[in-house]
Each structure stands twice: as structure tokens, then as C-alpha cells.
Curated annotation (Swiss-Prot):
Site (Proline switch): 237
Full protein name: Adapter molecule crk
One Gene Ontology cellular component annotation held by this UniProt entry: actin cytoskeleton
Pfam families cross-referenced by the UniProt entry: SH2 (PF00017), SH3_1 (PF00018), SH3_2 (PF07653)
Alphabetic keyword roster: Acetylation, Cell membrane, Cytoplasm, Membrane, Phosphoprotein, Proto-oncogene, Repeat, SH2 domain, SH3 domain
GO terms classed as biological process: actin cytoskeleton organization; cell chemotaxis; cell population proliferation; cellular response to endothelin; cellular response to insulin-like growth factor stimulus; cellular response to nerve growth factor stimulus; cellular response to nitric oxide; cellular response to transforming growth factor beta stimulus
Record-linked InterPro entries: CRK_SH3_C (IPR035458), CRK_SH3_N (IPR035457), SH2 (IPR000980), SH2_dom_sf (IPR036860), SH3-like_dom_sf (IPR036028), SH3_domain (IPR001452), Tyrosine-phos_adapter (IPR051184)
CDD domains registered for this protein in UniProt: SH2_CRK_like, SH3_CRK_C, SH3_CRK_N
PANTHER family registered for this protein in UniProt: ADAPTER MOLECULE CRK, SH2-SH3 ADAPTOR PROTEIN-RELATED
SH2 domain sequence ranges: 13-118
Residues recorded with modification Phosphotyrosine: 108, 221, 239
Length: 304
């Protein structure tokens, strides 16, 4: 299913000058396909498409050739002798940002299409904290996690606290940007020296140290897939191969258990990223990031 946003509504997806760290703070933990567009801080005139996908935040550079267009571009024609700007992301070229966003509503970037812009309400919710305002804890014991929403850690790990929904269970982030619930009795409060904070907690999926808010962009950019369209179930059955094991909660009878290498018949594609399908004679829902779609033109090549 394609995204449910208006690509012509600039205010919903364009954030202007926003650092990579700020983008990660807004998108980390959001569902797959939530995104924003911002100005590149290292390449004036270019843009960056930041997207929550596959349990991390990916950043795709959008290069602009010629005069930079307004966002969204004005319908007025460029002056004589001035070539209209072209926007390039990976191997694809577009006349405008709305056209680019429309394309990735129905084509995969890496593991997701664009579903919806990140909510503006998160900007004022306190989600973006300067390093000196953040709260940290240090692990006293190893914790392997008991279910999918837990954050495993080792004794001595430094974690950043994001939220305290329960007295004995807090939401935290580790040095790789992974988030989850941690048991409070397993940790102690920790106050790092301000100069060493960036060495303790990473700010993006590449594992590089976070930069001050508004600082330069660390790490490389992701590259979108080449013309991977969202499949259409109306054209016939769609099959996928499991690439990540899934052990669902025992109390959720509608969830589908998956083993790496198994074949899944996809029966419904939901915009939330929770797909429905059949595997080993059972039906249920599963995260689409746990499977890889087979080549629908030559599916027999992947059935072995």
C-alpha cells in the first residue's frame, strides 16, 4: 500500500536546516517509512531524505544540479538561458521534491517505501536533548532481554534514558542507537564528563560519534534500491523468503512465527509495515523487514 501523505504539502515533510543528529532523534523508534526532508549541512543546495527503516535511521543524499528549486518548486518557468534544476537520488532523477516523494511512495528505498512524514508535535515534545540535558545509566549486570521490546546490554554499558513509562522498566538507547525497555534494578545512575559523552552514546546507525546540534554530517549516506516497486497483490500471489527469525509473543495468536529460509505467501500488505501471510500452513501477521520479496517475474529461481 502506498503512503498516505500529500507530497505537495511542504510544511508536513520539509524541516529546513536540521542536523543529522536532530533527524535521528526525531525518527529513531518511529515505525518503518516515517521520514523527513532536510537541507544538507555539508553540501549547500542539496537535500537529505532521512527515513526510519529496519530498526535504524537511514539518510539519503539528494543532489541538486542547476539553480536550487523552491520547496516545493514554483510553477513559474526559469529565466531564458537558465536550465531547470534536477534532483538526483541514487540513479533516479526528478524535477521536484514532490515528484521524488511520490516515486518512493511506491518504490523501496532499501527496506521500506515512504509512508508518512514524522509528526511536527515531536519537535516540541522534548525528544531532542542536548548532551548535557540527557540522563544516563550504567549497567550493573548483563541483561539478555526477555522479549522483542527489551534492550539487551552487558555489564558496564552506558545507556541513555529516553522515557520512564513504568517504575521498574525504562526506555533506553545504547551506543548503536538501538532502543528498548530495560529493568531499572539492573542499572545505576551515571553522569559522564561532558567531553566524553559523544564517545559513550552514538547518534546514528553508522556508529560514528554524535556531533553538536547543527554540526556537520558524520558518516556516509545510504543508497536507495534500484527500481524496487511495492508489489501489487492484484497481479497474483506474492512470495517472500524469510531473512530474519521471528519468535512472536506466546499470547499473540495472530502473529506468524518465522525461520530463516522459509517461504511466505504474502496475502495482505498493510501501510503500517505489518504484513499478513501464510507459512507452513499457518496464517498471521509479521514485520515486512523480516522477509525479502522474491523476483515475481522469475519466482521459481528462489523456490529451491
Amino acid at each position: 500500500m502506498a503512503g498516505n501523505f500529500d507530497s505537495e504539502e511542504r510544511s508536513s515533510w520539509y524541516w529546513g536546516r536540521l542536523s543529522r543528529q536532530e533527524a535521528v532523534a526525531l525518527l529513531q523508534g518511529q515505525r518503518h517509512g516515517v521520514f523527513l526532508v532536510r537541507d544538507s549541512s555539508t553540501s549547500p543546495g542539496d537535500y537529505v531524505l532521512s527515513v526510519s527503516e529496519n530498526s535504524r535511521v537511514s539518510h539519503y543524499i539528494i543532489n541538486s544540479s542547476g539553480p536550487r528549486p523552491p520547496v516545493p518548486p514554483s510553477p513559474a518557468q526559469p529565466p531564458p538561458g537558465v536550465s531547470p534544476s534536477r534532483l538526483r537520488i541514487g540513479d533516479q532523477e526528478f524535477d521536484s521534491l514532490p515528484a521524488l516523494l511520490e516515486f518512493y511512495k511506491i518504490h523501496y528505498l532499501d527496506t521500506t517505501t515512504l509512508i508518512e512524514p514524522v509528526a511536527r508535535s515531536r519537535q516540541g515534545s522534548g525528544v531532542i536533548l542536548r548532551q548535557e540535558e540527557a540522563e544516563y545509566v550504567r549497567a550493573l549486570f548483563d541483561f539478555n532481554g526477555n522479549d522483542e521490546e527489551d534492550l539487551p546490554f552487558k555489564k558496564g554499558d552506558i545507556l541513555r534514558i529516553r522515557d520512564k513509562p513504568e517504575e521498574q522498566w525504562w526506555n533506553a538507547e545504547d551506543s548503536e542507537g538501538k532502543r528498548g525497555m530495560i529493568p531499572v534494578p539492573y542499572v545505576e545512575k551515571y553522569r559522564p564528563a561532558s567531553a566524553s559523552v559523544s564517545a559513550l552514546i552514538g547518534g546514528n546507525q553508522e556508529g560514528s560519534h554524535p556531533q553538536p546540534l547543527g554540526g556537520p554530517e558524520p558518516g556516509p549516506y545510504a543508497q536507495p534500491s534500484v527500481n524496487t516497486p511495492l508489489p501489487n497483490l492484484q497481479n497474483g500471489p506474492i512470495y517472500a523468503r524469510v531473512i530474519q527469525k521471528r519468535v512472536p509473543n506466546a499470547y499473540d495468536k495472530t502473529a506468524l512465527a518465522l525461520e530463516v529460509g522459509e517461504l511466505v505467501k504474502v496475502t495482505k500488505i498493510n501501510v503500517s509495515g505489518q504484513w499478513e501471510g501464510e507459512c507452513n500452513g499457518k496464517r498471521g501477521h509479521f514485520p515486512f523487514t523480516h522477509v525479502r520479496l522474491l523476483d515475481q517475474q522469475n519466482p521459481d529461481e528462489d523456490f529451491s
